[in-house]
């Protein structure tokens, strides 16, 4: 049985070192201008080459995110970005927009393409379509249960990747327009403002129940205890979310995932101290989708 890859987020050079020295098998980082975390310290052509050299010298793979939707006017700059990524020696590109995937196939066909979670692939048919389009891996939607992950993984014919730790979208990744609607900042363009993390007033709660709570904010996903199950299912990679977080967070999350993969105990309190929105949830993978996944004890649907 192949060992599941631990894939760590990188949003700065400090996070890169933290991920590598903590033992990550691979890292993913954004190329400036075309990735879903514009607020991170993203990489240009020169710094990407340095990052790839640093990682490859230590046996760590590098996946580059070009995973925003792209405007037609941006295609010339996108072509330059793809050429820079290919020249860097990166191991794969993560993309959402099919225009990006098509251009990669034309400009750098040797570069493996991974379908971003922003594509919302949540069925076997969706994964098979990506295979037909030449993708070698699909990052499955975070909203899937373990049986759904198993079904897709066993029958899709390409690698699957699952989020194992980090933030959850209150909608479905790639389908939320709340930030764009309320503040003109699109998650699909890499600039989600996270309005779901704010407190909201609920007027329909029973008398005496506080109404102004974080009704829309989900707890962070943490399914490190399920790494052995995902590995047994044949999932290729376990992904840690968090390119906007800190080197300390990356180190804690990678260390916990390595321990979980090997069946060793890990310090859950250390994970909470590194970053936690009032605890963790594994509700999606467990198939238990309810109000306990949210920050507020009183959920708007209760």
Enumerate the language-model features and the residues they cover.
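Aromatic- and glycine-enriched glycan-recognition loops and surfaces
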Residues: 40-49
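RNase H-like DDE/DDD metal-dependent nuclease/strand-transfer catalytic core used by mobile genetic elements
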Residues: 104
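Alpha-helix capping/helix-boundary segments
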Residues: 99-100
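Beta/alpha (TIM)-barrel catalytic core signal, keyed to glycine-rich beta->alpha loops juxtaposed to Asp/Glu
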Residues: 120
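Surface-exposed amphipathic alpha-helical tracts and adjacent flexible/coil segments at the periphery
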Residues: 1-21, 26-36, 51-52, 58-68, ...
């Amino acid at each position: 049985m192949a060992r599941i890859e631990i894939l760590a987020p990188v949003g700065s050079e400090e996070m890169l070192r933290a991920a590598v020295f903590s033992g990550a098998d691979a890292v993913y980082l954004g190329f400036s201008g075309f990735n879903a975390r514009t607020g991170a310290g993203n990489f240009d052509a020169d710094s990407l080459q340095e990052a790839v050299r640093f990682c490859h010298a230590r046996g760590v793979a590098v996946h580059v995110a070009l995973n925003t939707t792209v405007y037609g006017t941006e295609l010339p700059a996108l072509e330059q970005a793809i050429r820079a990524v290919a020249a860097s020696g990166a191991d794969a590109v993560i993309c959402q927009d099919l225009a990006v995937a098509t251009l990669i196939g034309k400009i750098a066909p040797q570069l493996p393409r991974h379908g971003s979670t922003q594509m919302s692939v949540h069925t076997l048919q969706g994964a098979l379509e990506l295979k037909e389009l030449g993708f070698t891996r699909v990052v499955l939607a975070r909203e899937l249960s373990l049986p759904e992950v198993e079904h897709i993984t066993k029958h899709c014919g390409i690698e699957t990747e699952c989020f194992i730790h980090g933030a959850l979208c209150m909608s479905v990744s790639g389908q939320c327009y709340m930030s764009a609607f309320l503040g003109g900042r699109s998650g699909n363009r890499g600039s989600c403002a996270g309005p779901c993390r704010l407190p909201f007033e609920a007027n329909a709660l029973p008398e005496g129940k506080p109404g102004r709570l974080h009704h829309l904010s989900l707890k962070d996903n943490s399914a490190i205890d399920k790494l052995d199950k995902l590995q047994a299912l044949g999932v290729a990679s376990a992904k840690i979310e968090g390119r906007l977080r800190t080197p300390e967070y990356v180190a804690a999350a990678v260390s916990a995932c390595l321990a979980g993969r090997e069946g060793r105990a890990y310090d859950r309190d250390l994970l909470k101290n590194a970053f936690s929105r009032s605890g963790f949830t594994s509700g999606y993978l467990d198939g238990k989708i309810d109000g306990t996944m949210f920050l507020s004890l009183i959920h708007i649907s209760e």
